[in-house]
């Protein structure tokens, strides 16, 4: 089966733009706050939130690079979505999509590919927002000397919320697709 490429939906385009803004903020925030940091900063914190290792403030500049990896990969996958679905379907593990896509009229298939990538973009955006919050908490901790409770809350949020929202969104799209084919 070959699905013709089409542009993202308006929702997908908005999520893509928000992702680009979030990635830019992941880089902008550290660059803007870097000059406010002392030369020696806490670079590791123990379980209680107290620093247990110190180093140069330059070490903190790795955060935007590390935090940008997952969102950047998701944006690349989104850009290549039709190539992946048409040539390498084994890399896209969406059983409900593959079970139903053959039942959808050919001219609507690209629409549904784009709809299934909306939650992927939302996942990336939530991760980026969580990473930005973690970045803020870490930079705040370098000045205050202690990780704020906010860091731990965001850490839990970054782990749990994206997956919950991702699977909820996917199930909604699968239900809409099933309604379109009359099941």
Curated annotation (Swiss-Prot):
<keyword id="KW-1003">Cell membrane</keyword>
<protein>
    <recommendedName>
        <fullName>Uncharacterized protein AF_0163</fullName>
    </recommendedName>
</protein>
<dbReference type="Pfam" id="PF07853">
    <property type="entry name" value="DUF1648"/>
</dbReference>
<feature type="transmembrane region" description="Helical">
    <location>
        <begin position="149"/>
        <end position="171"/>
    </location>
</feature>
<keyword id="KW-0812">Transmembrane</keyword>
<feature type="transmembrane region" description="Helical">
    <location>
        <begin position="60"/>
        <end position="82"/>
    </location>
</feature>
<feature type="transmembrane region" description="Helical">
    <location>
        <begin position="13"/>
        <end position="35"/>
    </location>
</feature>
<feature type="transmembrane region" description="Helical">
    <location>
        <begin position="117"/>
        <end position="139"/>
    </location>
</feature>
<dbReference type="GO" id="GO:0005886">
    <property type="term" value="C:plasma membrane"/>
</dbReference>
<keyword id="KW-1133">Transmembrane helix</keyword>
<dbReference type="InterPro" id="IPR012867">
    <property type="entry name" value="DUF1648"/>
</dbReference>
<keyword id="KW-0472">Membrane</keyword>
């Amino acid at each position: 089966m070959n699905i013709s490429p089409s542009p993202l939906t308006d929702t997908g385009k908005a999520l893509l733009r928000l992702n680009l803004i979030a990635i830019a903020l992941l880089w902008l925030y550290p660059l803007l706050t870097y000059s406010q940091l002392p030369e020696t900063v806490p670079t590791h914190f123990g379980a209680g939130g107290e620093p247990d290792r110190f180093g140069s403030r330059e070490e903190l500049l790795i955060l935007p690079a590390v935090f940008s990896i997952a969102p950047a990969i998701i944006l690349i996958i989104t850009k290549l979505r039709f190539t992946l679905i048409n040539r390498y379907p084994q890399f896209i593990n969406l059983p409900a999509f593959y079970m139903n896509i053959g039942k959808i009229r050919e001219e609507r298939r690209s629409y549904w590919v784009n709809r299934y990538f909306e939650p992927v973009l939302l996942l990336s955006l939530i991760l980026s927002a969580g990473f930005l919050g973690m970045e803020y908490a870490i930079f705040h901790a370098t000045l205050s000397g202690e990780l704020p409770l906010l860091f731990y809350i965001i850490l839990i949020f970054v782990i749990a919320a994206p997956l919950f929202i991702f699977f909820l969104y996917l199930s909604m799209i699968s239900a809409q697709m099933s309604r379109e084919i009359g099941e």
